[in-house]
Amino acid sequence: MAAKEVKFGRSAREKMLRGVDILADAVKVTLGPKGRNVVIDKSFGAPRITKDGVSVAKEIELEDKFENMGAQMVREVASKTNDIAGDGTTTATVLAQAIVREGAKAVAAGMNPMDLKRGIDLAVAEVVKDLLAKAKKINTSDEVAQVGTISANGEKQIGLDIAEAMQKVGNEGVITVEEAKTAETELEVVEGMQFDRGYLSPYFVTNPEKMVADLEDAYILLHEKKLSNLQAMLPVLEAVVQTGKPLLIIAEDVEGEALATLVVNKLRGGLKIAAVKAPGFGDRRKAMLEDIAILTGGTVISEDLGIKLESVTLDMLGRAKKVSITKENTTIVDGAGQKSDIEGRVAQIKAQIEETTSDYDREKLQERLAKLAGGVAVIRVGGATEVEVKEKKDRIDDALNATRAAVQEGIVPGGGVALLRSSVKITVKGENDDQDAGVNIVRRALQSPARQIVENAGDEASIVVGKILEKDTDDFGYNAQTGEYGDMIAMGIIDPVKVVRTALQDAASVASLLITTEAMIAELPKKDAPAMPGGMGGMGGMDMM
């Protein structure tokens, strides 16, 4: 086991604080409408330019191990806030830095760290309650567009695109952001459920111009195994032919003789049919087939359930108003599933999202949820250069997350004003002086986001904050973009409550841990072994015979 270095008390906290400051100072320049850019060097390709706090935080790794521990703890604040609320990472970082700084001073002055932490927790709980009480619910599409615009650093078109996407697919619907091949940013909406598997043979196409297979009012057979011969399927195929309706087969694979037979029947005109592979792999494939079954009112033909292909009847097949299949995607529109069954499945997936600890699983579950809950919207981000597209995509992702958060818990005045107002309203008292000091730490820290926004805009923070607090109305604040004072909500400067709340809770949680740290342990840097001596030169005059 390698030797370790241990630091205690003040020297540990000083090192840690230096790491916190380095990371927070790099992140906080991006805050607000006049936030500056940060350029990040990449080991390959062009440098990346971003105003996204969490992207900056993720890039920072310090040489000194003790400083790096402080930096990584604050990076954790940014990541956690990003995971829960999807935005507010810079605000969380600024708050964490302010609480740690004030807390370190208090501990150095001889106060009890645990009492300080209790005081901080008391104040944060009161502020969260105040924020939720002040929240204004979001109802109209215009308000959704406003939130999107603010989070996209004032770019109105992004706000409008997000509002339109949410209007079309619902607040729970999936909205994905992709890089476009063109210079324009565009929005495409896919109604119904779409998955990324296309037809198994181009002979299934019904519209040769567009190379699409369209099936109207179709039956859907869901089979979890491979189909290599059709003998077992003949009874159900004959039943479908008699109804005169088309059939879509979704199976692990359809190959060899089975595929050839289907194609021949399709070409002879006896059977309107198409076959696609089931989406996903392994257990996820089973779950997605079950989703499709619930959406279309069918049953998955699975030997696990004791259902054999020979015994399948028409009422086990799913139904859909329209199925559209391209080379790459299948879209099922208006499935015949019961609304109550679909809602039950949605609730089940939501519960799984709450329980999962894996980011990848959570993302896949959210995709499944959205497909069930109503359609998919794709925002394709265009730009003149790759660097511009990546920067814009960052902003749209942020704006999308902020908008979702706003729809969930409502909005408060932006620009750091909500926290500023809450700082004045903290009335809670601790059990002793040290706890009161903890409450005061939060009171002072709540001013830091507003101050940073004003400083980034090149104005004098103390004067602006003083002017805002002179007025007693909750919505009165400072527009850093235009340099004017006024009603923040009327000016469209708003923050989702979920973002502000999460930023404060995560910042206070990690900052409290840092304040109560008394020892730090890190591995000693390894000393490199001395280099091998060079080989001896040939000796003069000693030629080989």
Swiss-Prot record:
Q: Where does ATP bind?
A: T30, L31, G32, P33, K51, D87, G88, T89, T90, T91, G415, D495
Name the GO cellular-component terms: cytoplasm
Q: Which InterPro entries match?
A: Chaperonin_Cpn60_CS (IPR018370), Cpn60/GroEL (IPR001844), Cpn60/GroEL/TCP-1 (IPR002423), GroEL-like_apical_dom_sf (IPR027409), GROEL-like_equatorial_sf (IPR027413), TCP-1-like_intermed_sf (IPR027410)
What reactions does this protein catalyze? ATP + H2O + a folded polypeptide = ADP + phosphate + an unfolded polypeptide
Q: EC number(s) in its UniProt entry?
A: 5.6.1.7
Is this entry keyworded Ribosomal protein? no
What biological-process terms (Gene Ontology) are attached? protein refolding
Q: Does the keyword Isomerase apply?
A: yes
* Enzyme class (EC, first level): isomerase
What are the alphabetically sorted keywords of the record?
ATP-binding, Chaperone, Cytoplasm, Isomerase, Nucleotide-binding
Q: GO MF annotations for this entry? A: ATP binding; ATP-dependent protein folding chaperone; isomerase activity; unfolded protein binding
Q: What subcellular compartments does it reside in?
A: Cytoplasm
Subunit and interaction comment: Forms a cylinder of 14 subunits composed of two heptameric rings stacked back-to-back. Interacts with the co-chaperonin GroES.
Function noted in UniProt: Together with its co-chaperonin GroES, plays an essential role in assisting protein folding. The GroEL-GroES system forms a nano-cage that allows encapsulation of the non-native substrate proteins and provides a physical environment optimized to promote and accelerate protein folding.
Q: Which family does it belong to?
A: Belongs to the chaperonin (HSP60) family.
Record protein name field:
Chaperonin GroEL 1
Q: Which organism is it from?
A: Sinorhizobium medicae (strain WSM419) (Ensifer medicae)
